[in-house]
């Protein structure tokens, strides 16, 4: 036991450091908007639709700024967003010839999640860069009860977790014990209940955007 806790503490710190390499801050001008995750080495960033939207779901601007873990500020353009899925895809602009060192996150298997499994969410709550919070999976899938605005459900796929998400976590990664992406943190459904869009839904959305499918705002 005396060695177990120090080892666990070290492992969790290393895991947070690993995930933090793929975590970015997304902003529109001077206004901090939320978090995002580097999805591919060519500059795709995934976040929540509400992070890149103004009041009433209106698009803030097609131009955004993405701040990397090292503090580099890069221009990015909004490729597409889906308000129903609460997902958006940005593309880091490299027209100036820059080649930023991007660290895309590894995808996990969100369909294999089970209640009781350990997860970690990362983001920028209260302006704290790369803050981490951990918990366990409560449930996952599309068969969760519908509690309208008070909880998960509505026939959508969700990952529901026992941890306290804060506004700055929106758009940030939810990862498993290997640091693999299993969801994008989206909202709170209760005092200590967080909700995330599963990784397989994210991957499907990105594939449709890259294939040029229409129907996205």
PLM-predicted stretches and their roles:
Residues 1-16, 76, 121, 125, ...:
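C-terminal cap/linker of serine protease catalytic domains
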Residues 2, 40-85, 94-95, 200:
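Catalytic-histidine neighborhood of serine endopeptidases
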Residues 6-14, 23-44, 72-75, 132, ...:
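A conserved glycine-rich beta-strand in the N-terminal activation segment of trypsin-fold
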Residues 18, 81-85, 91-99, 128, ...:
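Gly/Ser-enriched beta-turn/beta-hairpin loop segments
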Residues 26, 41, 79-81, 136, ...:
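Residue-level recognition of beta-strand microenvironments
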Residues 37-38, 118, 164-184:
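Catalytic nucleophile loop of clan PA
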Residues 51-57, 80, 105-110, 115-154, ...:
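Flexible, gly/ser-rich surface segments that form the specificity/activation loops bordering the active-site cleft
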